[in-house]
Amino acid sequence: MAEYTLPDLDWDYAALEPHISGQINEIHHTKHHATYVKGVNDALAKLEEARANEDHAAIFLNEKNLAFHLGGHVNHSIWWKNLSPDGGDKPTGELAAAIDDAFGSFDKFRAQFSAAANGLQGSGWAVLGYDTVGSRLLTFQLYDQQANVPLGIIPLLQVDMWEHAFYLQYKNVKADYVKAFWNVVNWADVQKRYAAATSKAQGLIFG
């Protein structure tokens, strides 16, 4: 069975300073993200064993663990690509037009996305996603690593609101962290994800 691996980053840990510290990025990548990768591989191995033993209770437990850790791995893999030392400013082209159509303007989108991030209770993510059924952009709060996400949604932009993503630098002032995040958003990556999402067929099939 193929195992999941920790991806390399496109930039050095300190490249996002002063907006996100190198210390945070190094710990975030080598400790937290690495833990999710180990967790998903461990869950897969235990799930395979549970299925071989027809242990249904263990199957359900490890499917739950798999969803959590795989969610963490996927979310962080998108997170690193969503960031760039050359980021910031605003999107252009088709993505900019889609944001204007869905939210009224970029400023209104930014305010709504920031409110989703700052208002999240506990741990999770704020997400800009593409609804493949309704062919529209949506923002929503993702709880923990995998909860509250409708099927058929493709994530385009995410901000990590777990405390490990900001507390060493911003303490409990989440709003300052979210404000700093906008300075390093890699809109080229978000645009690429949008183009890929909109090129797909309808996400769910209705009989």
From Swiss-Prot:
EC number: 1.15.1.1
One GO cellular component, as annotated: extracellular region
Note on cofactor: Binds 1 Mn(2+) ion per subunit.
Cellular location(s): Secreted
Keywords attached to this entry: Manganese, Metal-binding, Oxidoreductase, Secreted
Substrates-to-products reaction catalysed: 2 superoxide + 2 H(+) = H2O2 + O2
Cofactor(s) listed: Mn(2+)
GO molecular function, one term: superoxide dismutase activity
Chain positions recorded as Mn(2+) binding sites: H28, H76, D160, H164
Family: Belongs to the iron/manganese superoxide dismutase family.
Biological role stated in the UniProt entry: Destroys superoxide anion radicals which are normally produced within the cells and which are toxic to biological systems.
Name by which UniProt lists this protein: Superoxide dismutase [Mn]
Source organism per UniProt: Mycolicibacterium paratuberculosis (strain ATCC BAA-968 / K-10) (Mycobacterium paratuberculosis)
Gene this protein is translated from: sodA
